[in-house]
Amino acid sequence: MKYRELIQFEPINEVVKFSRLEEEDYRKGLVRNFVFSRDYEQTIIPRICENLDYTQTYRPFQKDLFSSFDTFGLQIVGNYGTGKSHLMSLVSLVAENEEYLGLISNINAKDALSAIAGKYKIIRFELGNDQELWDIICYQIDKRLKD
């Protein structure tokens, strides 16, 4: 008997292709096939959602509901192949479209992500190195507002 006969899975053998994020099937595949490690499920995803949830519906780290709470930026750092792009794709896709929650198999991650699901308009663009960051961001926002 061979391993492939015992275990059925879809291998993850590619990096996130930014150019394909407009394809619905590709998006669904990224969400459906996301591998939730214990750290992602219990710490990283809840922490990201906590910082993105401006409705204050999700505060697992806050003991007193009436105390002030500050949000802050997060920087995702890791070695090549550790899932940084997949994680950010998952978060941005769910934040943009609540329907993707149904594709998530992990109950704890689904619960955390439900706090931000469908509440954001995501603007995706690639950064070059020949312009000022401020100019690039302002141009992209202006362009999307005209759409």
PLM regions with names:
Residues 1-82, 89, 94:
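Walker A/P-loop-proximal flanking segment of P-loop NTPase domains
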